[in-house]
């Protein structure tokens, strides 16, 4: 009887030890691709025109949102710092340019050249965002072996092209939330785990100052993505 009791206790302790040392499968290098939808918003300060026939005239500007599909690729590594805490490091690149958005410039009460007619608003230039990349850290909370809830804190950079072919590099902070879950083992040529993920991100880009007028504009991007990734064993 004593032998059986000791054996049961030994097995119980062993089971607890194994459970205590079980590690999240997300503690590893990862690669992933995702598709989603992004809304790019512009904001303008307005100002005064400093060049040409309309020098000294105040203006205002607006632009509609640019709504686009996104197709991103990312890679990185996650470290298990505590049984309940993972810290990921990652880099991401968006493979699809945003749709263009036309600025509308208004200089009320004026008439004249090709840009401003009868004091009304005229489409002036269009903008498009591309070469969009980011680096980030991703603190996460593992749920068992196969699930992970995470946040993203990072820094994003992109090019904003105008209609005349010039561009400005704009950068800003990135924040996001997401969820990952292992959905299959993979053991063919290479070994690892396939996982699915969903995430939402927000980026606030810095100001871009205009060249022929005072004032500036800024952009912000909100996106949601779904995708698949691979955890390398």
Predicted features along the sequence, with ranges:
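Gram-negative outer-membrane beta-barrel domains
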Residues: 21-233
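Cleavable N-terminal export/targeting peptides
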Residues: 1-27, 233
């Amino acid at each position: 009887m004593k032998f059986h009791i000791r054996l049961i206790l030994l097995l119980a302790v062993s089971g607890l030890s194994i459970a205590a040392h079980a590690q999240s499968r997300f503690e590893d290098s990862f690669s992933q691709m995702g598709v989603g939808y992004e809304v790019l918003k512009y904001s303008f300060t307005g100002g005064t025109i400093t060049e040409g026939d309309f020098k000294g005239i105040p203006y205002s500007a607006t632009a509609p949102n640019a709504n686009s599909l996104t197709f991103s690729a990312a890679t990185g590594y996650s470290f298990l710092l505590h049984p309940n805490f993972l810290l990921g490091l990652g880099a991401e690149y968006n493979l699809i340019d945003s749709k263009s958005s036309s600025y509308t410039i208004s200089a009320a009460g004026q008439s004249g050249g090709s840009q401003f007619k009868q004091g009304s608003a005229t489409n002036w230039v269009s903008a498009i965002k591309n070469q969009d990349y980011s680096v980030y850290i991703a603190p996460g909370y593992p749920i068992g072996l196969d699930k992970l809830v995470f946040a993203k804190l990072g820094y994003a950079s992109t090019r904003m092209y105008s209609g005349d072919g010039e561009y400005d590099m704009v950068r800003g902070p990135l924040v996001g939330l997401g969820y990952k879950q292992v959905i299959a083992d993979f053991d063919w040529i290479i070994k690892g785990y396939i996982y699915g993920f969903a995430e939402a991100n927000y980026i606030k880009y810095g100001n871009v100052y205009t060249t022929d007028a005072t004032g500036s504009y800024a952009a912000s991007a909100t996106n949601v993505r779904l995708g698949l990734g691979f955890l390398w064993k």
